[in-house]
Amino acid sequence: MFRILIIDPNTPFRESLRKIINNRFPTIEIQEAAAADEGLRKLNTFTPLLIFIDIYLPDKNGLDLAKKIKASHPEIIIAIFTRYDSPEYQTAANDSGVENLIPKDDWSGEDILALVESIFSDADINRSVKMDSK
């Protein structure tokens, strides 16, 4: 089963993102968290393939959270919603283990769906290859 965790303090944003993804991919299990600590607690019982994180969280910077998650779950893909797009920020995101930066002011549902489809299709292919090699 494919899973996504959305960590963002904005409830309407989380709900909108969940709805967009579930309308196209109804079998993906999605959980939400409003803060970093809540998201980290969810990782104790819920292991997603993809995590969307807002750069601004009430209790931790999104890049710091990404780095912490990558330290214990290097296989999880992380996408950060941000308003920053400078090369320095891209470098900081890469250093934190972030695979995708998404402009918070300029994202579309289709962009998110294309990202999700790409990630989960690659995961499905990798899982098939592993099963075939056994």
PLM regions and their residue ranges:
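Acidic catalytic/metal-coordinating carboxylates
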Residues: 35, 61-64
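The feature encodes the CheY-like receiver
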Residues: 58, 86
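A short, hydrophobic beta-strand element within the central beta-sheet of small alpha/beta folds
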Residues: 75-85
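Short amphipathic alpha-helix used as the core "switch/output" element in two-component signaling
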Residues: 41, 63-74
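As written
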Residues: 93-100
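Active-site residues of response regulator receiver
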Residues: 8, 54, 82
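Acidic, metal-coordinating helix/loop segments flanking the phosphotransfer/catalytic sites
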Residues: 32-50
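Two-component/phosphorelay signaling modules centered on CheY-like receiver
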Residues: 11-31
